[in-house]
From Swiss-Prot:
Family, similarity comment: Belongs to the P-Pant transferase superfamily. AcpS family.
Keyword entries, A-Z: Cytoplasm, Fatty acid biosynthesis, Fatty acid metabolism, Lipid biosynthesis, Lipid metabolism, Magnesium, Metal-binding, Transferase
Highest classification ranks of the organism: Bacteria, Pseudomonadati, Pseudomonadota, Alphaproteobacteria, Hyphomicrobiales
Gene3D superfamilies from the UniProt entry: 4'-phosphopantetheinyl transferase domain
Protein name as annotated: Holo-[acyl-carrier-protein] synthase
Ligand binding (Mg(2+)): 8, 57
Superkingdom per UniProt: Bacteria
Organism in which the protein naturally occurs: Sinorhizobium fredii (strain NBRC 101917 / NGR234)
InterPro entries in UniProt: 4-PPantetheinyl_Trfase_dom, 4-PPantetheinyl_Trfase_dom_sf, ACPS, Ppantetheine-prot_Trfase_dom
Amino acid sequence: MIIGIGSDLIDIRRIENSLQRFGERFVNRCFTDIEIAKSDARKNRAASYAKRFAAKEACSKALGTGLAQGVFWKDMGVVNMPGGKPTMQLTGGAAARLQEMLPVGHRAAIHLTITDDFPLAQAFVIIEALPVAPAEGTV
């Protein structure tokens, strides 16, 4: 069952301006080490950061908190699954909020799609609660 949906649309030029104006202070405040390494290696660095920024905003909306109630920028990070598909890795307050949302006997699956077409970057997040299969041999 779907327990959270969030979306965000951002102007890449806004992130370009923040990168120029605040540099590493902005990057280190908002992004995880994995996101920084990936984005800094990209040809279009600002677009890469913008997609990740939009993903964090969308995820915070799907969590129902926005960037409040103990959910911070670096609690949410875009990571890639082995096949390359992006997803969100949650820690800290974001992970705690996700656990609060889950019905008993369920685990979370976070679905993420990110895209950019200058001057815009966009992200959608769907949080799904999936039933946990009972362990074999239990009654």
